[in-house]
């Protein structure tokens, strides 16, 4: 069964593809469709943005689409960067710049608790949607560690593993990550939803 992921982010594509392929899905993404329109993320929550992306792409393609909106919420920054995680340091969406700004804003801060949040929305061309949310609690480190992952992964420490998300192997990350948790919630409902 084909499923299109509504993202141009190669890191998200790789992570979601690794989780969806074993479920029997043939995964494509907006990277395979360079002419597909970009959705303006005007929502104020991860769920709203995921639904905007999924419903617009499903209507455009006439096919079921899975959209992810995810980000980092840092307690000492009142939940920022939140839905602006990708654009925290500016519209160019640079992981390095975002991480540098986060470290700058947390300079001298002892409360470094944070969470990754992922909202996944599966939409049909009819507009019917199924939305789930996954979170993982952690802390922000003082310097980037690890080569795997993307975004804030090199700074986000997973307490139970004493590693940053960027130090985790793909299989480890799939078990504990916010995206993995959301996908497991979706997994129980995805086949009936797609067939219904």
Swiss-Prot record:
Active site per database record: 69
Residues at which Mg(2+) binds: 40, 69
Keyword Hydrolase: yes
Presence of keyword Ligase: no
GO function terms (MF aspect): dITP diphosphatase activity; ITP diphosphatase activity; metal ion binding; nucleotide binding; ribonucleoside triphosphate phosphatase activity; XTP diphosphatase activity
Catalytic activity reported: XTP + H2O = XMP + diphosphate + H(+); dITP + H2O = dIMP + diphosphate + H(+); ITP + H2O = IMP + diphosphate + H(+)
EC number(s) per entry: 3.6.1.66
Cofactor details (free text): Binds 1 Mg(2+) ion per subunit.
GO biological process, one term: purine nucleoside triphosphate catabolic process
GO cellular component annotations of the record: cytosol
Amino acids binding substrate: 7-12, 70, 150-153, 173, 178-179
Cofactor: Mg(2+)
Family matches, as Pfam families: Ham1p_like (PF01725)
Record keywords: Hydrolase, Magnesium, Metal-binding, Nucleotide metabolism, Nucleotide-binding
Top-level division of the source organism's lineage: Bacteria
UniProt xrefs under InterPro entries: dITP/XTP_pyrophosphatase, ITPase-like_fam, RdgB/HAM1
Main enzyme class: hydrolase
CDD domains in the record: HAM1
Subunit structure: Homodimer.
Similarity-based family: Belongs to the HAM1 NTPase family.
NCBIfam families membership: PRK14822.1, RdgB/HAM1 family non-canonical purine NTP pyrophosphatase
Function: Pyrophosphatase that catalyzes the hydrolysis of nucleoside triphosphates to their monophosphate derivatives, with a high preference for the non-canonical purine nucleotides XTP (xanthosine triphosphate), dITP (deoxyinosine triphosphate) and ITP. Seems to function as a house-cleaning enzyme that removes non-canonical purine nucleotides from the nucleotide pool, thus preventing their incorporation into DNA/RNA and avoiding chromosomal lesions.
Name of the featured protein: dITP/XTP pyrophosphatase
Organism: Exiguobacterium sp. (strain ATCC BAA-1283 / AT1b)
């Amino acid at each position: 069964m084909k499923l299109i992921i509504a993202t141009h982010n190669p890191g998200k594509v790789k992570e979601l593809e690794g989780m969806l392929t074993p479920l029997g899905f043939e995964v494509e993404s907006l990277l395979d469709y360079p002419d597909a329109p970009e959705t303006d993320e005007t929502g104020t929550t991860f769920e709203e943005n995921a639904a905007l992306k999924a419903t617009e792409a499903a209507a455009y393609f006439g096919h079921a689409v899975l959209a992810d909106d995810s980000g980092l919420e840092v307690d000492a920054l009142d939940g920022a960067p939140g839905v602006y995680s990708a654009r925290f340091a500016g519209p160019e969406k640079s992981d390095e710049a975002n991480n540098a700004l986060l470290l700058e804003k947390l300079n001298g801060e002892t409360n470094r608790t944070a969470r990754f949040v992922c909202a996944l929305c599966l939409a049909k061309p009819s507009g019917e949607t199924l939305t789930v949310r996954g979170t993982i609690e952690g802390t922000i480190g003082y310097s980037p560690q690890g080569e795997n992952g993307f975004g804030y992964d090199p700074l986000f420490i997973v307490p139970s593993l004493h590693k940053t998300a960027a130090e985790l192997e793909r299989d480890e990350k799939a078990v504990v990550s916010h995206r993995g948790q959301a996908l497991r919630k979706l997994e129980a409902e995805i086949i009936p939803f797609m067939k219904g």
